[in-house]
Each structure stands twice: as C-alpha cells, then as structure tokens.
Regions:
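Accessory carbohydrate-binding/adhesion or oligomerization-edge regions at the termini
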Residues: 18-118, 173
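Bacterial Sec-dependent N-terminal signal peptides
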Residues: 1-21
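Accessory beta-strand-rich segments of carbohydrate-active enzymes
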Residues: 22-31, 35, 46, 60-64, ...
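Generic structural signal for beta-strand residues in well-ordered domains
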Residues: 11, 52, 77, 146-148, ...
Length: 176
C-alpha cells in the first residue's frame, strides 16, 4: 500500500505580489481540476461506507499573517514539518488562536481594488497587519487496499474559507 501525503495551502484573499497575476486574482480562474459542484450524496453498499475515508483529525499546521512568510516548498514529500503544530481538522484558525476574528455586518474588511487583493486597507482594519493570512496543512494517509485499481479517487472539501491549492505526494493536483 502506498502512503499518500496530502497538503493544502489556504490563501485568504490571496496574492503573492501586486505585480504578478495569480489564480486568485484572475476572475476567469475559479478552479483547476475541480469536479462540477453537486449535492454530496454517496450511495454505500453497507452502513459503513466502503468507498470513502474521512481525513478529519490531527494535521500538521503552520499559519502566517502574510503570504511572503509562507514556506513555498512545504508540499515536497521530504519536507520536515516536525516544528509545525498539531491542529484539529475541521477547525477554525481564529478559534484555535491563529489570526484575529473578523466580523463585518456591512462593507468589507479589506481594500476594494479588484482584482488585486493585497491593497493596503485602512490602518485601523484588522487586515492591515494580517493582510492575507495563509494556513498550510500536511497529513499522510494510506488508501485502503484495492482503491488504486478503481481508477480515480476524489477529494471532497466540506468547508474552506477561501482559495486553496492541493498537492498529493509533492504534485499539485488542484485549486479551488
């Protein structure tokens, strides 16, 4: 059985530099390798599903307030994440002590400058210091015996705050 390493970086309101067009600043790029949206209904042969596994649990996690502080090569299979924290998934960053909770009943907590998302907000805004937080997650897992013979295997994310990329075994496989 192969061991798979699943990684994803979550980019909130993301851009890495104002001069470069990134996927999250291009309104024509809403996804890469994503299946069409649909209801999450999965038939099972038995009460305990034999065609899905849950990856909820403890993941390795690293949070940064700005993209420039992220680790760009964190997705490589030989990357050492021993200094990263153990983080529950699913979970909210702010509830777990990373970043500042933002509640806006009207308006936006960031500078409106489409398609750029890193414009400097007002000094009093929370996003002035946490311009574009990035969460990086890592987890290793094994597919059950026989799954590779099935052909395709799908990942389903049931809640992500904003844009994210997914890597498996060091290879970028998607963006949403």
């Amino acid at each position: 059985m192969k061991i798979y390493t699943l990684l994803f970086g979550l980019l909130l309101f993301s851009q890495l530099s104002a001069q470069t067009a990134h996927d999250w600043e291009n309104h024509h790029v809403l996804q890469i390798n994503r299946e069409p949206a649909r209801a999450a209904f999965t038939p099972f042969h038995a009460q305990k599903g034999d065609c899905s596994i849950c990856l909820d649990g403890t993941w390795k996690f690293r949070w940064t307030p700005v993209p420039d502080e992220r680790i760009a090569e964190f997705y490589q299979t030989d990357f050492n994440d021993k200094d990263w924290v153990s983080f529950p998934v699913p979970a909210n960053w702010e509830v777990n002590g990373y970043g500042t909770p933002i509640y806006v009943s009207a308006g936006y907590p960031f500078k409106i400058d489409p398609p750029r998302v890193m414009g400097e907000p007002k000094v009093g805004y929370t996003t002035y210091k946490e311009r574009n937080p990035v969460g990086q997650y890592r987890r290793s897992f094994q597919l059950p015996a026989g799954w590779e013979a099935r052909g395709q295997t799908f990942l389903r994310f049931e809640g992500v705050m904003s844009a994210f990329y997914v890597w498996i075994n060091g290879e970028r496989v998607g963006y949403s």
